[in-house]
């Protein structure tokens, strides 16, 4: 029988019906989160797995980047900058300002309270950042860079390329940058981040009745990088805008001088785009556009759709006469004119010189012979009206060299803040100077202790009289300050002995005041006995002491184990520690120690997942650590909640055995909110007390599944092995040298 191919019209119809059916089915799908919205979400612990990386688990980005000819890459970027493309022509024939905005917006979502955001990972490629209102048309900037990425492939990540393109742009326009470091690996999926709870773009429901911005958020409105350039919620009040600027830039770790340098330096270049009303001209964002758009969004149907018809923020104009050159014109214009409110062609509020002054100063970005007045945003006027900002801008205007250096350093900080210590930096353009915000630690300057030394040091620790729980709590306090989001904290540096960490409530300051001097004495006495230039740091002693305590706890439970230990940590000094910068690392909740303060912005169980995410733990690792730390009596302030064992200080699987024991009946405590009591079902006798974090391992189906593995008769050995492996992982999270 002869078979015929379907006609194109029939094929199109079948495709249309299939797509419609698929969309209907997808729209009707009901997820678990709909039925049980309060159920604890464990998905943050399962993101960024190696299986999602197309380069494979063995891919070594540092090695790949090391093979890169960085000079050649920069030359190629420089060529792209001045090669205008018909599909998206360059303003003033130069893509430099466009790429600066791309790099800035890639890095500028960094926030200090949880370390999320920043350029690492290249998250600007993914939703929601890819489609944020503040990132309009940056999809085109990355497409302009695709030939560079295509050429060099796995040798340079998108995360590094976007920042490097910003640096090269500055240099090509006459600015001397402070340096550049590679080392940002790419993510392959969107990061799960709390960007706010608003349901509409540019909505603002993130301030309390006092006007305080909710933590850990860094922007004033949903979909903005920092603040509304027209003023808070679109109200053109420069002083109110200054307050928002100070708050949001402060949440990005910038002080007033750095903030001024960034705004004034960045707005020296380029222009804003608001040739038409976005509501009438601009189409769907990249995520909402059809497949035929191939990932590009905001299609503009007005005029050419680009060039002099470009619509981005809705604001329109340039700040300086020479938008592709490093000059002092931004500050000169800010103070040289009296500024009055005006409206862009799109109807957005901006500022222009009064009485028509400067009407013909600024050349059009695309139309030869056409000129305009310079413009300012409300947030620019804030740099003149706010007393502190005015002092800084006035000083910079009088001292161009100081302004240039301040902008160079602030730009470097902006684009490198989430990379962690300088030891993670790659490439030939890394500046030699160590900066305080990099949390510097002295370089290893001595031979490390060997196996025999380690054994002798363990004996000294055990003979010190410090209890097992005290050693475990101290080591955990030192190492668990690490944040995988911005690679800060950790045991290296022994900053636990310095302010502010030694005074954090979660770290039991009174206990530290007793334990640390004893460990310091052990360190000093031991170093006196060493030969051959060998030394051991207090940072190493703290970690080794924790491991030694765990070995002792395991022996008490009938196990002979060795907790892995790699020496080589160093001790930071007070001069290398910015107290205010480290203050934001203070845990307001650490569920692994059953610690929760009123300042925690997450409920206990969610705080557990958040802390585990920061420690880059998997669900089994998190589970093993909680169970082990409970039986080791490692709760903050020696609290007994969740210590489900009659032998605290022994490493056993008792936490899971007793949690899963059906002879215990649990109920809420009638006297203490947030606590639970476990009673013997037969006698009614009180057995245990617990927090929601303790009980979540029996109530949450997925966590219970893991708890059952460790609570089974054949799960004892597995638990001990898994606990030690997870403990060692946490102790080494900041060991970027191994």
Curated annotation (Swiss-Prot):
SUPFAM superfamilies xrefs: Heme-dependent peroxidases
Entries under PANTHER family matching the protein: CATALASE-PEROXIDASE, HYDROPEROXIDASE I, BIFUNCTIONAL CATALASE-PEROXIDASE
Cofactor(s) essential for the protein: heme b
InterPro entries cross-referenced by the UniProt entry: Catalase_peroxidase (IPR000763), Haem_peroxidase (IPR002016), Haem_peroxidase_sf (IPR010255), Peroxidases_AS (IPR019794), Peroxidases_heam-ligand_BS (IPR019793)
Modification(s) after translation: Formation of the three residue Trp-Tyr-Met cross-link is important for the catalase, but not the peroxidase activity of the enzyme.
Cited NCBIfam families: cat_per_HPI, PRK15061.1
Note describing how the cofactor binds: Binds 1 heme b (iron(II)-protoporphyrin IX) group per dimer.
Organism in which the protein naturally occurs: Shewanella amazonensis (strain ATCC BAA-1098 / SB2B)
Signal peptide: 1-26
Family per record: Belongs to the peroxidase family. Peroxidase/catalase subfamily.
Record: active site: 105
Catalytic activity of the protein: H2O2 + AH2 = A + 2 H2O; 2 H2O2 = O2 + 2 H2O
Site (Transition state stabilizer): 101
Crosslinked positions (Tryptophyl-tyrosyl-methioninium (Tyr-Met) (with W-104)): 226-252
Binding site for heme b: 267
Protein name: Catalase-peroxidase 2
Keyword terms of this UniProt record: Heme, Hydrogen peroxide, Iron, Metal-binding, Oxidoreductase, Peroxidase, Signal
GO CC, any one term: cytosol
Cross-link (Tryptophyl-tyrosyl-methioninium (Trp-Tyr) (with M-252)): 104-226
A GO MF label: catalase activity
UniProt-listed Enzyme Commission number(s): 1.11.1.21
SUBUNIT field: Homodimer or homotetramer.
The protein's role, per its UniProt record: Bifunctional enzyme with both catalase and broad-spectrum peroxidase activity.
